[in-house]
Amino acid sequence: MAASGAVEPGPPGAAVAPSPALAPPPAPDHLFRPISAEDEEQQPTEIESLCMNCYCNGMTRLLLTKIPFFREIIVSSFSCEHCGWNNTEIQSAGRVQDQGVRYTLTVRAPEDMNREVVKTDSATTRIPELDFEIPAFSQKGALTTVEGLITRAISGLEQDQPARRANKDATAERIDEFIVKLKELKQVASPFTLIIDDPSGNSFVENPHAPQKDDSLVITHYNRTQHQKEMLGLQEEAPAEKPEEEDLRNEVLQFNTNCPECNAPAQTNMKLVQIPHFKEVIIMATNCENCGHRTNEVKSGGAVEPLGTRITLHITDPSDMTRDLLKSETCSVEIPELEFELGMAVLGGKFTTLEGLLKDIRELVTKNPFTLGDSSNPCQKERLQEFSQKMDQIIEGNMKAHFIMDDPAGNSYLQNVYAPEDDPEMKVERYKRTFDQNEELGLNDMKTEGYEAGLASQR
């Protein structure tokens, strides 16, 4: 991954040599400009480099660009005028997400083979029914379909088959049998499971039923293990020692980060805030001076509650849009009248108003990259247009609806405008979590009482 403002090393076969004669061009407004043949300002950076073939000086050209609906990349090209050696390579420059992501797709019909898939270099692809796995970093990233992934795997297995058959290798026959099984998957004679596990969080599998829930697709966000962090080249910074007298509640802390829109350096502000009639939370806000993008995120400042919380609000008046709202990362949102459900971890944690969250949901659904452009499905466009119109009616107060927040961790909040009295239009339920919910929160294997005895026995 390329850091903002840095230049990636040259491709294999080239070593950069110092050259005072070449000065870097002035930095553009955006580090990664959308790729376009008509953009005259989008010029590659040229660096004189050492050719590892003839050891004379050649030229490396670097182009920082962005592929629409995909991610940022660095295109590098080396050529040597002395020996004719040349090399071209594409490297990812996308930002590693806060969490890894795992897509589990059950392919039941031929239509599922046409789902759009974004697979990055760090993603692992598995088909459990065939005990088949494509390890991470064994293939370059690709924008393809489910069928394209299988076709690419078949091509890779067939590549060295002629040499194996010529040498009468015993594995050639077994590979042929396995290739036949992969080709049968493309016919979808029976259901099978496709798993794409990406620790970087940058892979994607299309939901053709958006904004409705996809019963065939399960999306799981998870925290990376130490091994996965090392594989991605991420290093945890040692926490800085803070003075004992430091009071974080009355101070706004700042730390450096990269803008999620233009990838330019930006600053994030963080502060502890006490929400009335609720608890303490951490609010983080980022403001990019380069492109003007603004974002905010909320983290819970307390522990997981003993019981989960389900809040149901009957929206009957436009004034309901002004209610303060805290949505944690573990909270899901449901609007039954629209047959809409927003899963956990989507949109992250937010401290906003009800109107602000509904607008964020509308923008998230309507700006899905696979529903835009000439190749999108007209029926899907109509569904999204109808969904957007109904959402506008709810925001404007012209349509009554139920707004449900379900947080197994109990760290979400919706303002009661009648506090401390009960709100006649709002229902707050406390419930006991299921085993699966505790498993997803990592609570089943957590021992908080009597652990001293276990440690003593291990010694």
UniProtKB/Swiss-Prot annotation:
A zinc finger (C4-type) spans 51-83, 259-291. Its main location: nucleus. It comes from the Eukaryota. Signal peptide: none annotated. PANTHER family: ZINC FINGER PROTEIN ZPR1. Residues 1-20 have a biased composition (Low complexity). Coiled coil: none annotated. GO terms for cellular component: axon; Cajal body; cytoplasm; Gemini of Cajal bodies; growth cone; neuronal cell body; nucleolus; nucleoplasm. This is Zinc finger protein ZPR1. Belongs to the ZPR1 family. It is found in: Nucleus; Cytoplasm; Nucleus, Nucleolus; Cytoplasm, Perinuclear region. Acts as a signaling molecule that communicates proliferative growth signals from the cytoplasm to the nucleus. Plays a role for the localization and accumulation of the survival motor neuron protein SMN1 in sub-nuclear bodies, including gems and Cajal bodies. Induces neuron differentiation and stimulates axonal growth and formation of growth cone in spinal cord motor neurons. Plays a role in the splicing of cellular pre-mRNAs. May be involved in H(2)O(2)-induced neuronal cell death. Keywords: Cell projection, Cytoplasm, Differentiation, Metal-binding, mRNA processing, mRNA splicing, Nucleus, Repeat, Zinc, Zinc-finger. One of its GO terms (molecular function) is translation initiation factor binding. It comes from Papio anubis. The gene is ZNF259. Residues 1-32, 439-459 are annotated as: Disordered.
